From Swiss-Prot:
It comes from the Bacteria. This is Protein-glutamate methylesterase/protein-glutamine glutaminase. GO terms for biological process: chemotaxis. Its EC number is 3.1.1.61, 3.5.1.44. CDD domains: CheB_Rec, REC_CheB-like. GO terms for molecular function: phosphorelay response regulator activity; protein-glutamate methylesterase activity; protein-glutamine glutaminase activity.
Amino acid sequence: MKNLRVLVVDDTILYRKIVSDLLREIPGIEVIGVAHNGKIALDKIRLSKPDLITLDIEMPVMNGIELLEHLKDIPDAPGAVMLSTLTSDGSRMTMKALELGAFDFILKPQEKTPAANKAALANSLKQIVKTYRLRNIGFSRTRATTPASRLSPRTTIKREIKTTDRSIKKGKAEIVVIGISTGGPNALTNMLPQIPGNIGVPILIVQHMPPVFTASLATSLNKKCQIEVKEAEDGEAIQPGIAYIAPGGKQMKISASKNGVERLIKITNDPPENSCRPSVDYLFRSVGDYFIGRATAVIMTGMGADGTKGLEVLMAKGAHSIGQDEESCVVYGMPKSVADAGLIDTVCPLNKIAQEIVHTVKLY
């Protein structure tokens, strides 16, 4: 496999040096240069044609968002990994970057010592850059960066499930649960607006993200969707036609009200599962307790296997299941895990997922 050629773009000298040095320590990575603003980066991208850029958002002359806008007009443009700050403005701008097609983002560490900051950044960079290299080197880069709205329609595949308890009949779904990670904001931006306003069921979403960022994601999606989208709050009753996004850094599950009639959202500080908080497995297990034969579970783009164990529980209780296909995933990790485990009823491209969700709810 050839080296991944990376351009480092940041207006801070310290970060340009630290990121460049850390990247050079990763096997298979070649740092081809640095740039201190988007305009210089754009010139270097046209000249040197890197595979990937690490990109700061706030820069003089041309910021990271403006650079991403320009990259849309460049054939075979590089992927982008954003370096973001844990602030409201930082999260809002990061959501914009992800919607514009950035591969993922890394938080600029806020540890107690410079050494701890460097170690945290090294760990994040290594994981994301290695994943990008495996996903893109040897494939056309446009495969991972083309907006889903421009992807050509592909076939939805119905699968025979090996593990479902056939004694539990699948009925109309009364709740939809979604697990998603890397590539999620862009995928949700394309998929959720296709859900009709009269869907008539609640939708619960676990998107692997840190605190603050999930609130920005919910705000951004709410402006684009026919249904309401909000960050979930502890103790609220789930309502039809609302999508609830699990808060970053917390776990989200379903519980029963005191009278046993309503289903409530419970936000907890329970430990991470699969190194994730929020965790898809954690949510899915709880839904299985209250919606036997009446749930639809969706696994979308993301690295790792979070959601596999939880989906196994749901499928044993008669849930419908939908998996995103490999071609439309930014990272085919979570969907591959559940597909390999024989837990998916239907595999479909991103632009057909909403249609399949509606089918399980309406069963027409």
